[in-house]
Every structure is written in C-alpha cells, then in structure tokens.
Amino acid sequence: MVDDTSAEACAAGLNYLAQVYHDGVQVTYPLYSEEEIAAMPSRAHAELYYCPAEQPGAKFAIVLSGNSLYYSGELRGGVSTAWELHEQGYAVFSLRYRIGWEAGDDAPLEDLARAIRFVMDNADTFGVSTEDYALLGYSSGGQLAGVFGNEEKGWGRYGVPKPGVLLLAYPINNFFEAKPAYHLLMDTDRLERRYYSYTVSKLVTPDYPPTFLWYGRNDLMLKAFVYPLQGPTLAKALEASGVPNRVEVYDNAKHGIGIGVGTDAEDWVERAAEFWQSVSE
C-alpha cells in the first residue's frame, strides 16, 4: 500500500528503476546462494533493490522499511526513500529482510550484515564509496538499525564496518509487551535474547554512530508501546553518551508516513542527508 505521503516519490523511483533496468543495470540481487537457500529456504526472501547514483563514487545507504510481521513496506518506505536520497546524490539499496516466523535466530540482522558485506565486496560494480555508509530505518526497521549500530550486538558481531550514520524515522526503541509474542512466534525453542528483545537506548555507547532521529507527537504506534520510553528515551540516551545527533519532533507526523509529504515531517530526508554529510566531513 502506498498513500499520498509517498505516492509521487514512489512512482518516480519505480520509473527510474525501470529506466536503469532497461539500460542494462541489474536492480534486484538475492543475498544468499542456492546452496544457502537450500539449507534454509527462508533466505530466498532476502533481497536487495539497487537504486544507482548518477555519479560514481557516491556514498550509499541501506533502507530498512518497517513491517507488521506479515507485511513489509518496501514500496512506501523503500522505493520512495531511495528516490529522495537519489535526488541528494546517493546510491541506495532497499533491503527486503526476513520477517514474521522467518525472522527467528536474528535472521534480520544476518540479512542486514550480508547486505552490507555484499555491497562492500562489490563496491566497484555498484560505483559506490565504502566510507561512511548510512542505515536508514523506519519503525521496526529503525529498531534493527539501532541494534546494528551497537558494536557487540550489531556490526562488530557480524564483522562488517561500522555505519557512518544512522537515520531513524519513528523507530521502535522498546517492543515491551510484544517481546513474549515475538519469542513465541520466532524463537520458541531458544532461550537466548534476540534482536526484538533489545532496547535500543540501552545499546547506545559513546562510540555509537552519529544519529538523526525523528518521531511525531501524534504517533499512535509509539503511544501503544509507551510513548515516553520510545523516541524521547532514545534521544536522551544519545545526548547522555555524547553521540553526535539531531533530533526532530513533529506535531503532525503519524506512524508509517514514510517520507512524510504533506505532514510536518516533509523534507526530513533532505535534512537527514545534510546531517549525514556534516558528520562525514
């Protein structure tokens, strides 16, 4: 589903992808080999969608859309955001990661690490810089990006370079009552903590990546998960740890609005790109 807050950018992004595909550029990449998929069939659902930059040597971002266990927002969050960042001069990869019952044993973190490694290993093919890459996450995708920003739980654990910046749009900081349900759905036979059990603000350390964070005061999803312990708590943790950050809070910016056209969050992607540039200098 694509609503009015993302429709125009989504259409522009799809048209651009169709054009580059027509010009001979591959835009869809599986993340796992046939042998790896045979060993774990759910890996077939992990893919990268590539939106090339106009100029070689551009920095790249990986976009993690939100999901509702059975639906992920590659169109609303992925393609529209890819187009907005493309307009700012970046290369963008929208990640389709495993969700729902396929997301057990930290599968989404594995997918993200595999995506980063794949882009890094093929940087010449994609024409991208390997320095200061961004993770841009919406909602539960923002929670994934936030966990991955921690060295022990994320990038260091998987042996990939540290993100240059996190760009988090209405991220879930703490899943609260949903954690037992997620455990029953995804990891019934496991005792270890998994990605959904972590509170992002508790993973913020002084060496955490610079972070652009925004959320809305009228976000009902964040209110369902105890609003003060979501964005506000994450913002305090960033400040307390001395992490370079920019936090924007809007009166009219509901959950799931993506790039936010027609809301108080409109043009947030441009401001996030400016922040990214400022912390990369």
What are these model-predicted stretches?
Residues 75-93:
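Short amphipathic alpha-helix adjacent to the substrate-entry channel of hydrolases
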